[in-house]
Amino acid sequence: METTVPLADPNVSESGKGSRLPVFLRGARAVPFLTVVLAGQLTYSAFEAFKGSLIVPLTETLGIRIDQFGILMGWLGIAMFLYVPGGWINNRFTIRSILCSWCAWRLVTGLILFSIPNLSFDVMIVIAASWGVWDAIGWPAVVNGVAFMSQDADKKGRGLAMGLLESIRRGVEFLMNVVVIGALALWSGHTTTVMRGFAIAYTLVLVPLIFALLRRVPKNAVAGDTAGKGESANVEALKGLVAVLIKPRVWLAGLAGLCVYWCYVNLIYSSAPYLSLVFKASDAVAGAFGIFNTGLLGIISGLVAGVLADYLFKSSTRMMGIALLITAIGTLAVRLLPVGDGMMWPAMILLMVMAFGIFMGKAVLLAPVAELNLPEHVNGSAMAVGSFLAYASI
């Protein structure tokens, strides 16, 4: 049976109740907030989270080649084209119901993928395509849930909420992958067994997560709650999506996110090879730098960006502008850096400056959409449209 903790009235500020913590980290909201954040990471923990340092043992476990793994990731990418229709679904159904359904589908299909040996590659493609469809629905529900849990009359905390979403997700992924890498080092002769075991275990983590979502995440307003007399909830959800699509500020916020995410994609795939090819860094140095520059720095930057957005700049939009400025300065400096002996360390420092700016911007990627103060029953579609624009670079 579902039990939820109701939110306080978002039109009344809770910041004056004797606590310096933002509203989503206090009282009845802290656990629901963390539950939504974990839903945004644990759904990916048994497949997409392995695509970096664990891609080779993952493909061996599935019995596929690297190029076939690329095909699966391509099918996952169809989410890009489905974010806008996913906005209608986010208007029509609650955050809780969407996240529970998303996790349940990942649970069932993930167990099929990793439990059945010699699974047909065609079946894998069908599973990957279904994941892409659900990602277009589920991810906007995650960011909408974060915005929903952090809503307060004084608006303070939304930037930090988005920053923590990024930091917690990166931290959880890093720790879960470290555990797998450690196990692979201990049982190096049983790679596929270890990978299969952890993939199944990480998939089964979704079971308690689903129960937590059902029990802890409150119901948000949806289109059916605001439909006029004689008007269906489906029509109201569609009207809400159209209303979001014609708002220039939603498009501008999404395009700003696109600039940040474009830089992010180039950073994670190019920084380590850049050091190796241009400054002749060893594979060990380039690899270690890549892990730090795109892993640990990302965890730190999310928290820093959230704090700066809320408590210094008073706006996630301003924070994103500052992040893009830092990124531009770092990029220009790297471009002007002469190639030669002894320049590898200056290049690494400048790449870290770039990474810091990029991750600060990525941490508040969709926070400007949350700051538009749209009605609760259409905010899900706004996050979907923002996701469509921000992730268009991939």
Where are these regions (language model features)?
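Extracytoplasmic gate region of multi-pass secondary transporters
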Residues: 51-55, 177, 247-302, 362
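Cytoplasmic helix-loop-helix junction between adjacent transmembrane helices
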Residues: 127-169
